[in-house]
């Protein structure tokens, strides 16, 4: 069975639009890019369309790699800007941690600044990473997480690690296992899990024989195979489990949450 993520995304967007109307001013998101990567530029265009739909002002700043840190710092002091998004990939020679640390903490709507990530250790989710939060929102709609055995396959800073912390949070209380490329007996671990979240960047990585019947599977994968978008989960898994589709799954909820965070940032700054 496919999980209906579009309905979740629409619900988030409807609430976001209502909150925008109550603000009394137009919140603004600035996306900073130092890349000509076609998929990144396409995503930024989709951000613009979504912002217009929600009543949020939007601007794209194309800067040179050398200017990105100083640009992010300037946006931190610009009172007309409520949210800052920094587009990836970055040039290989540049320090990703330095760049992400320059995103203003109070405007870090994607939850990439190490300071915001660190708050997850204390169960504080002011601006959690959008993709990790999307996985949590979907799971909370599908099941009660307390005591559930959850396996997160992938240990990235943007998804795997923060998601594990969010699932462990008091009140959610999942029992979490994090697997990665060095994990032994991965199939045995996933097969004994109530929930499997896959974020490894390998098309159709999770096979039907790796999942128990009735499990929930969250597919965070974005892979292009012969020009078509494919997830990390093999389509056959849907025959025995509840699975988020790709496209139209986690990504839809992730984008909706990005703009929810813009409004949250605006509300906090107004105070």
Swiss-Prot record:
Record's keyword annotation contains Nucleus: no
Coiled-coil portions: none
Entry EC no(s): 1.5.1.5, 3.5.4.9
Subunit structure: Homodimer.
Function recorded in the entry: Catalyzes the oxidation of 5,10-methylenetetrahydrofolate to 5,10-methenyltetrahydrofolate and then the hydrolysis of 5,10-methenyltetrahydrofolate to 10-formyltetrahydrofolate.
Protein family (similarity comment): Belongs to the tetrahydrofolate dehydrogenase/cyclohydrolase family.
Protein name: Bifunctional protein FolD
């Amino acid at each position: 069975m496919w999980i209906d993520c579009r309905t979740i995304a629409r619900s988030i967007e409807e609430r976001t639009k209502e909150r925008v109307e109550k603000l009394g001013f137009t919140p603004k998101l600035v996306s900073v890019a130092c890349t000509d990567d076609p998929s990144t530029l396409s995503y930024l265009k989709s951000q613009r369309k979504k912002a217009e739909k929600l009543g949020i002002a939007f601007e794209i700043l194309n800067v040179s790699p050398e200017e990105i840190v100083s640009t992010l710092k300037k946006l931190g002091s610009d009172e007309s800007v409520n949210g800052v998004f920094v587009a990836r990939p970055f040039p290989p020679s540049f320090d990703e941690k330095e760049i992400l640390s320059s995103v203003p903490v109070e405007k870090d709507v994607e939850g990439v600044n190490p300071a915001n990530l660190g708050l997850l250790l204390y169960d504080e989710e002011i601006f959690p990473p959008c993709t990790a939060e999307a996985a949590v929102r979907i799971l909370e709609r599908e099941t009660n997480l307390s005591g559930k055995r959850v396996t997160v396959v992938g240990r990235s800073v943007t998804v795997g690690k923060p998601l594990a912390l969010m699932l462990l949070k008091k009140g959610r209380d999942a029992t979490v296992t994090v697997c990665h490329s060095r994990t032994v007996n991965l199939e045995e671990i996933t097969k004994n899990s109530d929930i499997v979240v896959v974020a490894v960047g390998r098309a159709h990585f999770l096979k039907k024989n790796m999942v128990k019947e009735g499990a929930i599977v969250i597919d965070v994968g974005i892979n292009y195979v012969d020009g078509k978008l494919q997830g990390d989960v093999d389509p056959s898994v849907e025959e025995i489990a509840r699975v988020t589709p790709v496209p139209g799954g986690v990504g839809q909820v992730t984008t909706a949450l990005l703009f929810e965070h813009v409004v949250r940032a605006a509300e906090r700054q107004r105070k």
